[in-house]
């Protein structure tokens, strides 16, 4: 979901890290089936070792499904909204490299997060690459190695 400024006025968080535990987001249920291209990305991520996938709930209504969450253990990898927008929870170095290479936009409401849309078939490969980079980062791969995968 592409955030609207008015929607997020009270949680403007660009100067802090957002660390949200899966259990704080609402009832833990299997992820929903998404539209065609976002679903292809979701299915790929769910195959990866130690990934926890669950329903992503609406920020303001914990009974309204809003997409699919992905965690590596207790660390958030990112989530895909029902409309195909992805919010990816990266760190400073990785987000800067992603933004520099124009692979995503800066998520305006959380430091070091990036966002992008999965709207067409060509977006699937890029989305999987970005989720994979973040997955590898959370698994301890050195930042220089990750950045070299972007600068191919």
State the predicted function of each range.
Residues 2-152:
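Charge-dense, helix-prone N-terminal extensions
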